[in-house]
Amino acid sequence: MGIARKPEVMSPAGYWPQLEAALDAGADAVYFGLRHFTARAKVGFGLGELPQAMAALHRRGARGFVTFNTLVFDHELREAARALAAIAEAGADAIIVQDLGVLKLARAIAPDLELHASTQMSVTSAAGVRLAESLGARRVTLARELSLADVRAIRAETRCELEIFVHGALCVACSGQCFSSEAWGGRSANRGQCAQACRLPYELVVDGKVKPLGDARYLLSPGDLFALRQIPEIVGIGISAVKIEGRYKDADYVALATRAYRQAVDAAWEGREASIDTRQELDLEQVYSRGWGPHFLNGTDHQAVVRGRAPRHRGVRMGRVTAISETGVTIEPADAHRLSPLKPGDGVVFDAADWRSPQEPEEGGRIFEVLPRGGAMELRFANRALDPARIRRGDLVWRTNDPELEKRIRALPAERLPVSVRVNAREGAPLIAVWEAGGIQVTVESAAPLGAARNRALDAELLREQFSRLGNTVYALADLELAVEGAPFAPASLLNQLRRDAVERLEAAAAAPRRIEIRDPMTTLDEIVSIGMCDRVDRRKRLSHFAGEAMGQAFSPANSSGSGDPPPSLHLLVRTAEQLDAAIDFRPASITLDYLDLYGLKPSLERVRAAGLCPRVASPRILKPGEERVVDFLLSCDCPILVRSAGLLDTLRGRPHAALVGDFSLNAANAITAGELLALGLDSLTPTHDLNAAQVADLARAVGAARCETVAFHHLPVFHTEHCVFCRFLSTGSSYRDCGRPCDEHRLALRDSSGRAHPVMADVGCRNTVFGAEAQQASAHLEAWLSAGIRHFRLEFAHESAAQVVAVSQAFADALGGRLDSGELARKLARVSPMGITEGSLFVPPDYLELPVLQ
């Protein structure tokens, strides 16, 4: 696919100051959220402010994209439908969506409104792009874990618009696949409530023992993305938009980052070499940085993405401490000091060099005086601003704040919208001027014919002099064409009035809301739900029992209970050969194999078959370009597949396959989404872990409980990450090619400040999953789930031994068979689980049905 058009520079806005900063710096588009249904809670515009925000954007020739990129629960769908209609009515240029149900709802309410698939959709392949496009997305924001080679491969296989992040914070977990906030804080990253557990300190536990890592404590905290130097290559790939992260960042950050990428994109598009100097990089680093690089865009390097020293803004490294005295701190300056010297008023922090825990508060403050000391310099501070005892020789010095830079940013000239003017001036006829800016064209003309000039006739110089007086507007005169017949005379007053009229009309036309079809949101929602119910009833008529192949022998008619309902069945997911031995002895309805090495599990599959049991195989949660062989392998297993990505689901639609069970990672949070996924070919579905136990039951009733498989015991997969902790901290390698595969030899866990050790496991793609230390279990909710008609219960094991697998499985079998009440089940599970048990995400808060009304 050729390069169709220049990529948009897309900037973030938390509120008005950031929006205005983005426009002044030349953003083509600005993305922002409302107060709810957005992946960045606590920032955004009120619904009543949206028309004003869109008008401000359109007056500057920019587009406005509203983020609606969270999962939406069933009880919120009516409020969501009203919000979607209001967003369309306000003139939004696009809505950025995570939830497949919201995608369908938005398309039905406003068929002409542009829809973008959020990075929260976890799209990492051409198949994922095609699926999003088939469901109505015009643009897809690709996952930040992709390399430029991956992006180029996806571009070659698709025609949909693609967008990538080029600057700002990185999440350690794949977007849309993080459940740490849900597990540990009762709040969800998929709901805009990220608790930033990745920025907390952890100890590395290897085979049961803590491994010293020096000053590396923040083992899941990645540095920031900085891809300014990769822009020429990105433009050459044919990307539709380059995106700057940062809806929580301030206006200075937005202004500086937008201007830098604006200049880089313009230069690359015009074939010019980008003029990126060290001072510009230092300014960007100063305004906000945790340490940065192109990271995944340049390919895998697990040594570079996470340094582990600090999780917060560092700014620019300005030197190293050489001496400490009662009057001040002497430092040897770094190269950055030559371009951007330290000065009074700067804020600095002293970064302890291997002698103090990075978790402790750091010494720092504002410089009062800078004194040269030969090649060094002494920094002095106000009285008692520092504790000299907490600073030592060798400590790094970072400038975290530069007031002078802030002044320079705010003094930068605002980008203007170029305007072209074509003028026809003929003696004896009205003067006609056509003004065009940002794709909008208006025509103004004089009320009376032009007379003959007695002295100076109208010429281009006079016209430019009057029409270029646009200082208090958003426009700048770029091109002027004049066609003259005779020697017409046009007074300056007339030209000035025509200029004012043209500007007024351009601004009015730009700010006018786009007129698109908007259907009644409540009627539309009711129609979608009604049609979905009919489809589900029809499917149930065609499926007398649910996916017998996928669910194992327990679901044959011979095993049904007298009431016509099948008995409850257990499905075990195992990750080790030892666990498999125990699972086969237990004889569940099915056994799902979720092994590190896919290519070593076929003998295990045969063992399950030989035992007369139903085998299933789990797919990776992420599949990238070049990993298509994994799909071939999954199909060659000739057994049901636990599908964990939408891209894989799309790929399997076109190929013969056994039964498909959709996993939690598909993020089915409401009945519309669940219906869409089932319609795409799934035989059953596991709800997202963002739902509490009551919501799981409600969703099962809505979609048909026979098609729901719930997880009743597991360690919540809190992080799923491209970054490999094994490679980073147990090797000197950068990827699987040179790491020596420590994941084959060692058991790993991350121990948090409370002493909980969270298991870490790698998959076939070397991606890591960090599991919650405590076992999440549904003992308190089994009765309610059974009452909702749920009969499929999955038990998943991480580091459990064979004995623990047997004990947990037997306890659930006894509970489902009526031989154990919920309290006894919980007590048994607690005795089996060394780190304890928890309700975790299944906990049902008393106020969970309350949704703040959008203002």
What spans do the regions from the language model cover?
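Glycine/small-residue-rich interface belts in oligomeric ring/scaffold proteins
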Residues: 45-49, 55
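Glycine/threonine-rich flexible loop motifs
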Residues: 42
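Surface-exposed amphipathic alpha-helical tracts and adjacent flexible/coil segments at the periphery
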Residues: 1-24, 29-39, 53-54, 60-67, ...
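Short, low-complexity intrinsically disordered segments enriched in A/P/G/S/L with frequent Arg
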Residues: 538, 542-547, 555-561, 565-567
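Contiguous, structured surface segment used for ligand recognition
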Residues: 68, 108
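Conserved phosphate-binding/catalytic loop of the ribokinase/pfkB sugar-kinase fold
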Residues: 121, 125
